[in-house]
From Swiss-Prot:
Reaction it catalyzes: phosphoenolpyruvate + UDP-N-acetyl-alpha-D-glucosamine = UDP-N-acetyl-3-O-(1-carboxyvinyl)-alpha-D-glucosamine + phosphate
Keyword Lyase: no
Source taxonomy: Bacteria, Bacillati, Bacillota, Bacilli, Bacillales
Positions with a binding annotation for UDP-N-acetyl-alpha-D-glucosamine: 93, 122-126, 305, 327
Chain positions recorded as phosphoenolpyruvate binding sites: 22-23
Pathway note: Cell wall biogenesis; peptidoglycan biosynthesis
GO biological process: cell division; cell wall organization; peptidoglycan biosynthetic process; regulation of cell shape; UDP-N-acetylgalactosamine biosynthetic process
Protein's name according to its UniProt entry: UDP-N-acetylglucosamine 1-carboxyvinyltransferase 1
Organism: Listeria monocytogenes serovar 1/2a (strain ATCC BAA-679 / EGD-e)
Compartments (UniProt record): Cytoplasm
Length: 430
């Protein structure tokens, strides 16, 4: 079994370059299915297990896909099938984003109910509501969602919650629909804007991405194009916190301040120095951190994908902090693992009461989801002694070479196979 071992106490310094955004690249890869002409070329693609998974889904659907270095090419000009099987979709909830493109391109879609991180209920109802509004017949049978439509027709769709996945799926389906589709109360994340830009480069007519209302005028066909994926704001935020908690001085290259303004505001409240530079964001950690309360919200609010990492810096701050989760239920499973490291945390409903500053102690802990994996490694950076983090399958879904990037900044961190390493003598690793 692989694990990451961290010896706490090192200050991080230097620079680290961000990769393409996981949450942007997956829907963009799915959107290549809409192109009936040409070959799509996607650049700045991160080397993540989720990317390999969605590439496999597209291959199964009869697209020709290659992934070399940071570039994915997709030729979807052949006869695309419409059945995305459980063996792939179970690995990753985001696989459902192929449903909109399949429905638009082939008139039908059969996609297994999704899997992925176990962080509460993320119902697909909003996706299906949009498809039905455009004229699709939808049914759920034997663990599969089946949708068919002789033709999709533009419609007005109101989302009860600004779901990122539903916004993306309905937006993609609407690109080839007859007439105009208006989606209200949509997600406004930067990843939505990136997808809209890609669709428009293909010949779609998408207006309003980044606002609360998106308008799509359907076209007859889309043509493949070249596109570079935006930098990953969650990876950037994770490294910003790593720099802050270690009292370091780190330049986060390619980070876009406008994409993480809520995180920047909270870190500055805590006493962290944030400097916007020409090629990124510099973070300088303070001697003492001030306690702040945080509530996750849809963008432009504080991102739920930064919740567990933010809790690490909250538990190191002086005083009492509160973290409130409003986007997903059951996203506090990492709290028990952090308590093993001597964090003083108490769950009360949708909030966690955090008393600090904690004197963290190294322990063996298990990641419970993707962002929790990163958070536990961050905690290890400032814990006394050695922290061993297992269940790295979660980490690999969203971070490429996380330990290597931390090493380059000066952290004592190693990724090891414990069947080949004497974990009873951890000092020998460093």
């Amino acid at each position: 079994m692989e694990k990451i071992i961290v010896r706490g106490g090192k200050q991080l310094n230097g620079s680290v370059k961000m990769e393409g955004a996981k949450n942007a690249v997956l829907p963009v890869i799915a959107a290549t299915l809409l192109a009936s002409k040409g070959t799509s070329v996607l650049k700045n693609v991160p080397n993540l297990s989720d990317v390999f998974t969605i590439n496999e889904v597209l291959k199964y659907l009869n697209a020709d896909v290659s992934f070399v270095n940071d570039e994915v090419t997709v030729d979807a000009t052949g006869e695309i099938t419409s059945d995305a099987p459980f063996e792939y979709v179970r690995k990753m909830r985001a696989s459902i984003v192929v449903m909109g493109p399949l429905l638009a391109r082939t008139g039908s879609a059969r996609v297994a109910l999704p899997g992925g991180c176990a962080i509460g209920s993320r119902p697909v109802d909003l996706h299906l509501k949009g498809f039905e509004a455009m004229g699709a017949v939808v049914k759920i049978e034997n663990g599969y969602i089946e949708a068919t439509a002789e033709k999709l027709v533009g419609a007005k769709v109101y989302l009860d919650f600004p779901s990122v996945g539903a916004t993306q799926n309905i937006m993609m389906a609407a690109t080839l629909a007859e007439g105009t589709t208006v989606i209200e109360n949509v997600a406004r994340e930067p990843e939505i804007v990136d997808l809209a830009n890609f669709l428009n480069q293909m010949g779609a007519r998408v207006i309003g991405a980044g606002t609360e209302v998106i308008r799509i005028e359907g076209v007859k066909e889309l043509t493949a194009t070249e596109h570079s994926i935006i930098p990953d704001r969650i990876e950037a935020g994770t490294f910003m916190i790593a720099a802050a908690i270690t009292g370091g001085n780190v330049l986060i290259e390619d980070a876009v301040p406008e994409h993480i303004s809520s995180l920047i505001a909270k870190l500055e409240e805590m006493g962290v120095q944030i400097i916007e530079e020409e090629n990124g964001i510099r973070v300088i950690g303070p001697d003492k951190l001030k306690a702040v309360d945080v509530k996750t919200m849809p963008h432009p609010g504080f991102p739920t994908d930064m919740q567990s990492q933010m809790m690490v810096i909250q538990m190191l701050s002086e005083g009492t902090s509160i973290m409130t989760e409003t986007v997903f239920e059951n996203r506090f499973m990492h709290v028990e693992e952090m308590r093993r490291m001597n964090a003083d945390m108490k769950i009360e409903g949708h909030s966690v009461i955090i008393s600090g500053p904690a004197k963290l102690q190294g322990a063996e802990v298990a990641a419970t989801d993707l962002r929790a994996a990163a958070a536990l490694i961050l905690a290890g950076l400032v814990a006394d002694g050695y922290t061993q983090v297992t269940e790295l399958k979660y980490l690999d879904r969203g971070y490429n070479n996380f330990h290597g990037k931390l090493q380059a900044l000066g952290a004592d961190v190693e990724r090891v196979d414990d069947s080949k390493v004497d974990v009873t003598n951890l000092a020998s690793l460093f």
